Amino acid sequence: MAVFKTTLWRLISGTLGIICLSLMATLGILLKNSFTKLSVEPAYTPGPNIELQKDSDCCSCHEKWVGYRCNCYFISSEEKTWNESRHFCASQKSSLLQLQNRDELDFMSSSQHFYWIGLSYSEEHTAWLWENGSALSQYLFPSFETFKPKNCIAYNSKGNALDESCETKNRYICKQQLI
């Protein structure tokens, strides 16, 4: 009788131990995946930038900003005119996105949306200029000659540029250079 109780107790405790280890392993995997998902998926909703989060290899970005190659990007989900977008970015100590190269938006998912960037037509200079006053490099937008003067440029992650009236409401991307 005592041998039977000992064997039964060992069987029950062994089974419960295996179940406990399985649950702990599952919990560990779920926690790892949820933290990885949180740090990879950017929040595209605008809001105050209070908390800092590590999003980039070499720098920290504010909450709701995406870190990529030592720059921080705010990708809006609301639509504004080009000037409203520019003012919002300036209020966040950033500017509308000035593309340095066509690969700059590789981190974005394949979004169908067009976003205002910091490129508009300057009547004074009769040229397309970035918000900081520098000229547009033709290799970025080979078809820029077909853009209509007096417009602003919206861009999507597939590398397409669209010239629209600056009063049209679009989503927008702010860029903050940290280095």
Swiss-Prot record:
Record-annotated disulphide pairs: 58-70, 61-72, 89-174, 152-166
Record field: transmembrane: 11-31
A Gene Ontology molecular function term of the record: transmembrane signaling receptor activity
Gene Ontology biological process terms from the UniProt entry: negative regulation of natural killer cell mediated cytotoxicity; negative regulation of T cell mediated cytotoxicity; positive regulation of natural killer cell mediated cytotoxicity; stimulatory C-type lectin receptor signaling pathway
GO cellular component, one term: plasma membrane
Ranges facing Cytoplasmic side: 1-10
Keyword Metal-binding attached: no
Residue intervals of the C-type lectin domain: 68-175
Keyword Transmembrane: yes
Assembly notes: Can form disulfide-bonded heterodimer with NKG2 family members KLRC1 and KLRC2. KLRD1-KLRC1 heterodimer interacts with peptide-bound MHC-E-B2M heterotrimeric complex. KLRD1 plays a prominent role in directly interacting with MHC-E. KLRD1-KLRC1 interacts with much higher affinity with peptide-bound MHC-E-B2M than KLRD1-KLRC2. Interacts with the adapter protein TYROBP/DAP12; this interaction is required for cell surface expression and cell activation.
Protein name as annotated: Natural killer cells antigen CD94
Originating species: Macaca mulatta (Rhesus macaque)
